[in-house]
Amino acid sequence: MERLSQMAGRRAWCAEDSVPRQEEEDRTRPSKTVTFKDVAVDLTQEEWQQMKPAQRALYRDVMLETYSNLVTVGCQVTKPDVIFKLEQAEEPWVLEEEMFWRRSPEAARGRMKSFAFKDMAKDLRFEDVVIYFSLEEWECLRHSHRNLYRAVMLDNYSNLLSLSLADTKPRVVSLLEQGKEPWMVMRNETKIWHPDWVSRTEAKDSSKIKTLQEKMAKKHTCPTLEDSKTRGDREVTRELEGQQVHQEGHLRQAAVTSVERPDSVQCTAHREAHPGGKPCSSEKSQKTSLCQPPPIEREQLHSKAKASEHAQHGKVFNSCTSDTAVHPRPQESRKDSERKKSALAGGPDTSKPQSAQGSERPHKCKECGKAFHTPSQLSHHQKLHVGEKPYKCQECGKAFPSNAQLSLHHRVHTDEKCFECKECGKAFMRPSHLLRHQRIHTGEKPHKCKECGKAFRYDTQLSLHLLTHAGARRFECKDCDKVYSCASQLALHQMSHTGEKPHKCKECGKGFISDSHLLRHQSVHTGETPYKCKECGKGFRRGSELARHQRAHSGDKPYKCKECGKSFTCTTELFRHQKVHTGDRPHKCKECGKAFIRRSELTHHERSHSGEKPYECKECGKTFGRGSELSRHQKIHTGEKPYKCQQCGKAFIRGSHLTQHQRIHTGRRSE
């Protein structure tokens, strides 16, 4: 992967810099020959065998494209052996003896220090080489990519510190050293990290562009300085650009430090980077910045990168990357760079992208009325209505409407869960899932209904609840007339009538309707009880069980039967009780015809016919037909008597025993 990161970094450098640099150098200084060896990456047999087919295809495409770029600008005359091999679809690792690039990490760091810092030690700062991520970008990175980013940033800061070029420690370095997520810095410094590229390139006065071109020419007059800057940028950004390799072999550019250049140079570099694509047109027509991939790739990456459109000129920018973040070059004075930053961040001609405006959502779905910031977001949403799912998982065959959803699904097969809960140890694939899970422990319910004041942990729960107020379409079961607010809930309910249980437990073979029910059941085998009562310390497998138990301490019974006035601690108990009044007993025994209110009661009854007693006491070997009976029996061995009479202090194993005992004090006879 390190070789692949080098290659991806060199691909971006060659595509962006080879042609414009040659044009500028022709006017200002004698050309310096760049050979294929200067930008090629050779692989050993071991490295080649470790690469996946998609990575090999990416390597082949990049090497051939790099060679094509060098031939175009006249920097390569003879065709290297590795190109012959790649064109004939042969493995290129046979050229192991010609390895010449980055023989060791120590040598690479030595070159970086000697070239990148030799002639610009006076002006180079950490801000010139740092790379920032937003929260959305940070969540797109895998765990290994985040470790790579952390190592590169700390290594850069260490190099600057050894050369006495760092005065104070930046906040992003402090966060990385503490093991915290560095995207938090974005909240306070957004304007500095994301200056508006449009206000600079679309200047009304053409003399500003001409002045910028003249400055570019002056910067290229010093070969040593420019060469050192180029090498320094490549060394710093090489590994990070390689981490965003698209799984179909496409390269998604990571957030990199951009070089200021006029539109004419930018368009030339864009044409060379993507041969065969549409050339950039004039100022009045639609233009696309360098941060965008080719048209085919861009369509595949819209789910990962939110595009924002410029209102006046139709320019499209990738808001998920930081390619537009402009850092001052070391040759410029601090005063000039600060002036440019302030002009780009809040100048009079600045036009903010629409996605940044937040409230404006001009693109509306005709099916459901939902609005979006960009046409690409609307396009992805419309796939849900038409049922289009072009992205298919090769492991299980499941299809998804966007590539981002497919990437997240792949973690199910790899079992990659990087975000762990400190309370119960449960791991999640996304930080947003972890934040939602932590609300179970904290009891936080931030989503409140304005109609009735009821609060919910998740926005999805609130959305379903709002349907009850709005009188929206309701889904009714034809077998028992039970009504649900969405079709998915009805589908799960209908499995209780058909007896279908597709999710099987590997430990005991028990089947369940949904995977969430299976996960709850598996805690029976592990003995895990993550939900603890703060009053008595008792543990529970589910948060709902804990909430129900806590009402026993408070005496709260908010659910009341309208028929007899009896109160209950939860809605399920109320629903079960109401069947006593209605006489509804939908679960019938096939052996004797006896009917039951609950399905669990039918299951326990069927064991009386079969004689099955699956619950065995480990102390005395006695077996029971129900788990609750086993739990009661085990209290005999432990001596636990949790039900205590407040009148005389006598304790009992069961609550029913306490109820019978209390009649002695009240003088009430049992019916």
Curated annotation (Swiss-Prot):
Does Transcription appear among the keywords?
yes
Query: Where expressed (tissue)?
Result: Little or no expression detected in most adult tissues (brain, liver, kidney, spleen, testis, ovary). In the hippocampus, detected in neural stem cells within the subventricular zone and subgranular zone.
Name the keywords, alphabetized.
Answer: Developmental protein, DNA-binding, Metal-binding, Nucleus, Repeat, Transcription, Transcription regulation, Zinc, Zinc-finger
Xref: Gene3D superfamilies: 6.10.140.140, Classic Zinc Finger (3.30.160.60)
The entry's cellular-component GO terms read: nucleus
- Compartment(s) of residence: Nucleus
* Consequence the record notes for mutating K37E: No effect on transcriptional repression
List the InterPro entries hit by this protein, alphabetically.
Answer: C2H2-ZF_domain-containing, KRAB, KRAB_dom_sf, Znf_C2H2_sf, Znf_C2H2_type
Disruption effect? Mutant embryos arrest at 9 dpc, they fail to complete gastrulation, have convergent-extension failure and a yolk sac membrane-ruffling phenotype. Conditional knockdown in neural stem cells results in reduced brain weight at birth, however adult brain weights are normal and no other defects in brain development or morphology are apparent. Double knockout for ZNF568 and IGF2 embryos and fetuses are found at near Mendelian ratios and indistiguishable of wild type littermates at 12.5 dpc to 18.5 dpc. However, after birth few dead pups are recovered.
The text the record gives for the protein's domains is:
KRAB domain 1, but not KRAB domain 2, is required for transcriptional repression. Both contribute to interaction with TRIM28. Differences in repressive activity between KRAB domain 1 and 2 are likely due to amino acid differences at multiple residues.
Biological role: Has transcriptional repression activity, partially through the recruitment of the corepressor TRIM28 but also has repression activity independently of this interaction. Essential during embryonic development, where it acts as direct repressor of IGF2-P0, placental-specific transcript of IGF2, in early development and regulates convergent extension movements required for axis elongation and tissue morphogenesis in all germ layers. Also important for normal morphogenesis of extraembryonic tissues including the yolk sac, extraembryonic mesoderm and placenta.
What's the subunit arrangement here?
A: Interacts with TRIM28.
Q: PANTHER family from the entry? A: REDUCED EXPRESSION 2-RELATED, ZINC FINGER PROTEIN 200
Q: Which family does it belong to?
A: Belongs to the krueppel C2H2-type zinc-finger protein family.
Q: What name goes with this protein?
A: Zinc finger protein 568
Which organism's genome codes for this protein? Mus musculus
Task: Name the lineage.
Answer: Eukaryota, Metazoa, Chordata, Craniata, Vertebrata
Gene symbol of the encoding locus: Znf568
